[in-house]
């Protein structure tokens, strides 16, 4: 159980790291802190004493306690010797992330940088803890994959504080629009469009799309899905668009597909999946209904991960750059650090957008007519 003084200490540190209390800004008085955190004077003093000893705050006789300017504590020589990069991803050992990490580490280690890796599990609180660690330990730069990038983020102040402290960052796979950061990611609108167009070209008209909508990638892939239908003049069945959040990803898509397949009279002939991971899970549901892939149902994944060839049905999918993205992100953050660039405009020359490429395997085929022949 966390002690009261440590709780107060961590709360004050969080305000400093978030940029709520700026360097040389006054920390609340003892009485104010006692009231705010409902603790004793002894607890407040113990918390402040430790913060003073650790260089977070300083006292002025008769004036109070103030936030220390930690940028003043940075030794330029020491900074050159540190060469530490933080890498924050939503996941570490799952799916495409080991390949991205491997690509980044190969370049960073080649240039003498040490890499510390954090995972958020696509959770804002865990992202906050990772950013606090980055700001506390004074990394030279940060490569970060945003957390739940399509919804308002409570941690934007931490990124602004990184900028204030001169710590550059680049974002991969998605970005926070309000920050306009350097960004490396796929053209996900075109990716979703390409998935859908492939099925439409094969004669499929009843297509289900499943997209994770708390990440920007999912929102953009859905946009591409809708765009492809509009271009063909094919009206979408609203019940064939299934969206879900990170917390729902293991249940809702499967439950919704069960619901759709139970209605034999309006079964779809094609499915567009947010990623390969989802596609593989859906194959289990499809087997339950004795539906054959691709003879009766075509399925398209996204990312061309190792999972795309892990099943007996090899997935048609969209290729994700993975290792290449990691390499490019590492080169960009090194360039930002060594040239001390300040401009982080998202539409500047430093952002990299990768073109989606369709990898056709065995999970898609021409749609069959009611008589069982190709259209």
UniProtKB/Swiss-Prot annotation:
DNA-binding region listed in the record: 30-49
Domain of life: Bacteria
GO MF, one example: DNA-binding transcription factor activity
Entry's Gene Ontology cellular component terms: cytoplasm
Residues in HTH gntR-type domain copies: 1-70
InterPro entries, sorted: AraR_ligand_bind_dom (IPR033532), LacI/GalR-like_sensor (IPR046335), Peripla_BP_I (IPR028082), Tscrpt_reg_HTH_GntR (IPR000524), WH-like_DNA-bd_sf (IPR036388), WH_DNA-bd_sf (IPR036390)
Chief localization: cytoplasm
Keyword DNA-binding among UniProt keywords: yes
Coiled coil residues, start to end: none
Locations listed in the record: Cytoplasm
PROSITE patterns membership: HTH_GNTR
Function summary: Transcriptional repressor of the arabinose utilization genes.
PANTHER family, sorted: ARABINOSE METABOLISM TRANSCRIPTIONAL REPRESSOR (PTHR30146:SF150), LACI-RELATED TRANSCRIPTIONAL REPRESSOR (PTHR30146)
Protein name: Arabinose metabolism transcriptional repressor
Annotated source species: Halalkalibacterium halodurans (strain ATCC BAA-125 / DSM 18197 / FERM 7344 / JCM 9153 / C-125)
């Amino acid at each position: 159980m966390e002690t009261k003084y440590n709780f107060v200490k961590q709360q004050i540190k969080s305000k400093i790291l978030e940029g709520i209390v700026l360097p040389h800004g006054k920390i609340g008085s003892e009485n104010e802190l006692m009231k705010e955190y409902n603790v004793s004077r002894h607890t407040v003093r113990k918390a402040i004493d430790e913060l003073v000893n650790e260089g977070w705050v300083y006292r002025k006789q008769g004036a109070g306690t103030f936030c220390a300017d930690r940028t003043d504590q940075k030794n330029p020589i020491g900074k050159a010797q540190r060469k530490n990069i933080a890498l924050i991803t939503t996941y570490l050992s799952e799916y495409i992330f080991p390949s991205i990490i491997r690509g980044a580490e190969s370049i960073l280690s080649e240039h003498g940088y040490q890499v510390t890796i954090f995972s958020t599990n696509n959770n804002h609180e865990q992202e906050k803890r990772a950013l606090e660690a980055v700001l506390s330990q004074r990394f030279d730069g940060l490569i970060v994959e945003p957390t739940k990038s399509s919804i308002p983020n409570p941690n934007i102040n931490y990124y602004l504080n990184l900028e204030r402290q001169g710590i550059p960052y680049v974002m991969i796979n998605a970005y926070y629009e309000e920050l306009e950061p350097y960004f490396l990611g796929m053209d996900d609108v075109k990716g979703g469009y390409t998935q859908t167009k492939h099925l439409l070209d094969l004669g499929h008209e009843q297509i289900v799309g499943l997209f994770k909508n708390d990440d920007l990638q999912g929102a953009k892939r859905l946009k591409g899905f809708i765009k492809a239908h509009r271009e063909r003049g094919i009206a979408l069945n609203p019940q064939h668009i299934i969206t879900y959040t990170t917390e729902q990803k293991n249940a809702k898509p499967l439950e919704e597909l069960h619901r759709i397949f139970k209605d034999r009279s309006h079964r779809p002939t094609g499915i567009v999946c947010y990623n390969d991971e989802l596609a593989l899970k859906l194959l289990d549901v499809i087997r339950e209904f004795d539906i054959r892939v691709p003879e009766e149902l075509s399925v398209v994944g996204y990312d061309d991960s190792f999972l795309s060839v892990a099943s007996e049905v090899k997935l048609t999918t969209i290729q994700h750059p993975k290792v290449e993205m990691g390499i490019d992100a590492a080169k960009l953050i090194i360039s930002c650090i060594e040239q001390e660039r300040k401009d982080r405009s998202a539409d500047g020359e430093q952002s990299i957008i990768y073109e989606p490429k369709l990898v056709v395997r065995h999970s898609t085929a021409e749609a069959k007519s009611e008589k069982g022949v190709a259209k």
